[in-house]
Amino acid sequence: MNHVLAKSLISVVAAVSTLGLAQAQSAAENPATPAPKHEKQAPKVERNLKVFDNLDFDVFSNQKWDRLKESHSDDIVVTWPDGHETKGLGHHTEDLKAMFVFAPDITIKEHPIRFGSGTWTSVTGVMTGTFTKPMPIGDGKTIPPTGKRFAIGMATIGHWQGKTMDHEWLFWDNQDFMKQLGLSN
């Protein structure tokens, strides 16, 4: 009887794995070696890290765009993974909104690595979502959704002036992102 039960369990695990439900799509979600526990930082840095946690986990993930001013200055400079820069909170907000057009379920749920010094903070995270809506590419053209789920390891470095960031650097692997979206090999 135990042999039959074991075979049944193995079959269920194999079936679930085939559906992609049991395994992370990328090592970013399920790293072989998790990050060490967070080390307490100076009070000012801890305050900025808490603001940043709230930014990603609540404001960004729940698209509460009117609350971006809690963490970003009006004249924020944002350097994106491809190296281009945007200036101003309004421009940055529109760029963030554009990500949710093709993947309305994007979330960031944790910052496994978070630290800083003085007016600087740095966090890592995993941005997840599903490509379920057409992706606008300009001139009224779109890329049809692939239905692919993505889990992108990302990092953000922030420079703080007072209680908000005046410059934010975003890092993730765009090639890996495109592969996970099903748009490249």
Give, region by region, the residue ranges found by the protein language model.
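Bacterial N-terminal signal peptides that target proteins for export
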Residues: 1-10
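Bacterial N-terminal signal peptides
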Residues: 9-20
